[in-house]
């Protein structure tokens, strides 16, 4: 079992927290992490691209000239693809780029990125993040007290709304809960700031 130092929100040591090796101490599987990140990035694509095919463009219902006798090539519509202003052939249509991976793969990727952060000493555990009201300045003081000045993902327990509201407006700070933190967010962050309650929830879900 791995031990990490537990801090309070003033930056003082408040003891040790024992992490479950089944979640935070595995050998990271880089290929699985890669696959999940590609999947999550694909899901972020809007997919709203669209063009008009010959049935969608305006006009072109009448045959421009008779079939025979003019000496010109036969045409059925001025909105055929070979005409200027005609419909596009096989153009992009709105669609979702997202696809799902098996749950076991997604869970292995989560455990891999968590384990990597712990191994690299980029995992900061805090006993609680308690605020009586949303105060961005107060959360900035917490980060300063914990010597966190780089891109950080704050992982909270469910229902800690004041902490989430206090953190969300700070630059380089992203907020998630124990159940919504994604592999992409964790991998993109320089450090993780995780509450003790969130650690328990992560272990409950992934162990």
From Swiss-Prot:
Pfam annotation, one family: Ribosomal_L4
Positions of region (Disordered): 49-78
Ribosomal protein recorded as keyword: yes
Annotated GO biological process: translation
Assembly information from the UniProt record: Part of the 50S ribosomal subunit.
Function: One of the primary rRNA binding proteins, this protein initially binds near the 5'-end of the 23S rRNA. It is important during the early stages of 50S assembly. It makes multiple contacts with different domains of the 23S rRNA in the assembled 50S subunit and ribosome. Forms part of the polypeptide exit tunnel.
Family: Belongs to the universal ribosomal protein uL4 family.
Family annotation (PANTHER family): 50S RIBOSOMAL PROTEIN L4, LARGE RIBOSOMAL SUBUNIT PROTEIN UL4M
Identification of the protein by name: Large ribosomal subunit protein uL4
Organism: Streptococcus pneumoniae serotype 19F (strain G54)
Gene: rplD
